[in-house]
Amino acid sequence: MTIAVGRAPVERGWFDVLDDWLKRDRFVFIGWSGLLLFPCAFMALGGWLTGTTFVTSWYTHGLASSYLEGANFLTVAVSSPADAFGHSLLFLWGPEAQGNLTRWFQIGGLWPFVALHGAFGLIGFMLRQFEISRLVGIRPYNAIAFSGPIAVFVSVFLMYPLGQSSWFFAPSFGVAGIFRFILFLQGFHNWTLNPFHMMGVAGILGGALLCAIHGATVENTLFEDGEDSNTFRAFEPTQAEETYSMVTANRFWSQIFGIAFSNKRWLHFFMLFVPVTGLWMSSVGIVGLALNLRAYDFVSQELRAAEDPEFETFYTKNILLNEGMRAWMAPQDQPHENFIFPEEVLPRGNAL
């Protein structure tokens, strides 16, 4: 007698069917993360293109900010809402716009729309890297690295204005608008002297330096295994052997510096660690600015410079420049406040 042993058929529910469809092999992978990424990225980019094409910033900042008004690619922006709206999300159906699309554009409703969809789109992209890493069986360091840009975006566009009085003080989504925000951070927070900014600069420039050194060193030590003027075509993605000599690279840098990386895994972890840590540190600094925390204040130099007209340092010159930026920028940047500074309070000194 033959006994057949087998599993009872398992019923597949709608979740399993959807899971199979989302993870199907296609030119552009969708996945569960795609349910967040693609709609949010589409909305954020579409909102930005709409705003920069024909939406004015006259009612929020007193500025022209669209192609329709004569701005160009470097000066268009989706600008932040007016200061009076505080931290309202300015929903189209909310009490401010009341379902009126034109009014929603005028009061700056596109800014929170782009900011929030952009933030969730970036998070969706990081989840996409996690998901694909898991499916192909590799570690998720790409997603971990991408947490750096997400931290910067969230801290600059969301955390900073949340710590201030309104979304008005967030950067507008445009090249010149972000330049204005950088000048604002310097004038009102002395951002360049902040140690977290210094760590961010060290991380980004250090990462660029490591990238350049690594690329040049690999190019220097490629095996001459091709007949062409360059060795690019001699490489096969599936080849088992190395395409460059780590031993030669190690010997070269040992002669240059006296020390060199001898472990590829440690080398590449270091290239990951430096820029990502820089991004995270600068994000921490921005959250500090949101709370109006001060960094370095060399009060002794300021007091001596005030008493002794012959004593001045680069620090005291920068403090004067910051005072000038605040005095002349605030009336332009915040016209709704009607700032009027009498002549005697405007900074004077060798720096200006």
From Swiss-Prot:
Residues reported to bind chlorophyll a PD2: 197
A single GO BP: photosynthetic electron transport in photosystem II
Residues in coiled coil: none
Residues in compartment: Lumenal, thylakoid: 54-108, 163-190, 289-352
Compartment(s) where it occurs, according to its Swiss-Prot or TrEMBL record: Cellular thylakoid membrane
Binding of chlorophyll a ChlzD2, residues: 117
Subunit structure: PSII is composed of 1 copy each of membrane proteins PsbA, PsbB, PsbC, PsbD, PsbE, PsbF, PsbH, PsbI, PsbJ, PsbK, PsbL, PsbM, PsbT, PsbX, PsbY, PsbZ, Psb30/Ycf12, peripheral proteins PsbO, CyanoQ (PsbQ), PsbU, PsbV and a large number of cofactors. It forms dimeric complexes.
Family: Belongs to the reaction center PufL/M/PsbA/D family.
Protein name stated in the entry: Photosystem II D2 protein
Gene from which the chain derives: psbD
